[in-house]
């Protein structure tokens, strides 16, 4: 499954954002912050999925902020990571994937079909004029109105 997921993401990027390097390299700060922002957007959607009221959403975001501050404190306390930056980035992304799959396990959901649906939908992000539209700040591929 990992190869299939990587190949799907690679196909998306080759079509919409063909910047795959010839050799492994770290993400530069701007790209790193954009990727973290994309992940945070999805995490917040997940976090509020059980919320029925705006008050619950506000409470959820308070809890997210509390946990972010705790994570920051943990990082500040343990000191700088001595591994190469690319190792740190790859390890963190691997942990995110592993935790995501663990969440599927706890839900009793095989994600294969869901991930295929997401990939197929993402490959349809061309606008009616046949072009890709991007966010001016993050360079994220935008969804057409019909999407």
Region locations from a protein language model:
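Flexible "arm" and connector segments at domain edges
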Residues: 1-147
